[in-house]
């Protein structure tokens, strides 16, 4: 694991924490998880197992600290590392394509998987303030759309910045 990679992933985690904090909760304390975009970006740019583990754990802890979901700390800590490795597995299937379209498809699938993991773990550990299907439809699906649109906008910008800087070697 390189220091450059850690620094960039730390920046992604910080940006994700800021986004996660400012998005207001709705429907039983649930809110779209903007932290996922930054976690996914870290995985797309630095696809190594140790990086996936680090960014998954860090985003899980930060999400747990900033959650608006009642007793959502443990489900967040479970969700992020599991989702990080699921996303990484999907990435390995589509490794040849580093295009924005592939990132968008991976983001929508990753967000939906993350929502399923979070809601399932919350259901088993603390219960849900509403039905699984209602929360999935009202929070996870809109979050998948929002995250995908955000990834389509942000990912090419980050790639351009890294390409123009000395960090692009770290992102290969």
UniProtKB/Swiss-Prot annotation:
The way this protein sits in the membrane is described as:
Multi-pass membrane protein
| GO CC annotation terms, alphabetical | plasma membrane
Q: Which residues cross the membrane?
A: 7-29, 49-71, 104-126, 136-158
Q: Does the keyword Heme apply?
A: no
> Which phenotype arises from disrupting this gene?
Cells lacking this gene grow on 40-fold higher concentrations of the tryptophan analog 5-fluorotryptophan than the level that inhibits the wild-type strain.
UniProt GO BP? amino acid transport
* Domain of life according to the entry: Bacteria
The record's section on Gene3D superfamilies has: 1.10.1760.20
Q: Which residues form a coiled coil?
A: none
Keywords (alphabetical) are: Amino-acid transport, Cell membrane, Membrane, Transmembrane, Transmembrane helix, Transport
The answer to whether UniProt assigns keyword Chloroplast to this entry is: no
Induction record: Its translation is regulated by tryptophan-activated RNA-binding regulatory protein (TRAP).
Q: Where in the cell is it found?
A: Cell membrane
Q: Which family does it belong to?
A: Belongs to the vitamin uptake transporter (VUT/ECF) (TC 2.A.88) family. TrpP subfamily.
Write out the function statement from the record. Probably involved in tryptophan uptake.
Annotated protein name in UniProt: Probable tryptophan transport protein
Q: Which gene encodes it?
A: trpP
